[in-house]
């Protein structure tokens, strides 16, 4: 499964299926065929629960799906913009439950600044879309607060 566009839907993943939230109570379900490629990033201010949440998401994916890849973006949206990522393994999420912060790093990228060009004059949103498409991601998990979710 591969999304041609970055859409404005919330995705719920579990038990070998993907549901797209299409309204307050309606979900559409797709069977997952082949490898599922999940991008993950942490954004905004650092907080103690980011590692635990990443671990929970990863553990759920690895335990409920046979063929999944998790791609971690370094330093939040900046990693998505400039393709600074690493292929995560299940062992990367071991031993982080009680560690504060985030193993991926974080940066603040306010939504109001996303439409401004970067230092080389490139559109930040287009850079993120290009990385998403080039890596053939099926979805992006964004962990953070209000600003992170607004940017997502």
Give the ranges of each region predicted by the language model.
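Short Gly/Thr/Asp-enriched flexible loops that form oxyanion-binding sites at enzyme active sites
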Residues: 53-57, 146-152
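N-terminal phosphate-binding or glycine-rich loops at protein starts, especially the Walker A/P-loop
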Residues: 34-84
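Basic polycationic patches enriched in arginine
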Residues: 25-29
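Short glycine-rich or small-residue beta-strand-to-loop segments that form or flank ligand, phosphate
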Residues: 37-47, 103-105, 138-144
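Glycine-rich nucleotide/cofactor/substrate-binding loop typically near the N-terminus or early
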Residues: 66-135
């Amino acid at each position: 499964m591969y999304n041609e566009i970055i859409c404005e839907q919330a995705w719920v993943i579990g038990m070998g299926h993907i549901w797209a939230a299409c309204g307050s109570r309606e979900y559409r379900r797709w069977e997952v065929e082949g490898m599922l490629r999940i991008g993950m990033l942490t954004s905004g201010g650092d907080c103690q629960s980011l590692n635990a949440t990443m671990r929970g998401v990863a553990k759920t994916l690895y335990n409920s799906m046979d063929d999944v890849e998790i791609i971690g973006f370094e330093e939040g949206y900046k990693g998505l913009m400039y393709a600074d990522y690493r292929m995560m393994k299940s062992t990367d999420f071991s031993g982080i439950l009680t560690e504060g912060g985030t193993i991926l790093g974080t940066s603040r990228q306010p939504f109001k600044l996303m439409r401004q060009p970067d230092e080389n004059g490139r559109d930040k949103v287009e850079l993120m879309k290009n990385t998403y498409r080039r890596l053939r991601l099926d979805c992006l998990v964004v962990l953070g607060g209000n600003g992170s979710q607004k940017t997502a």
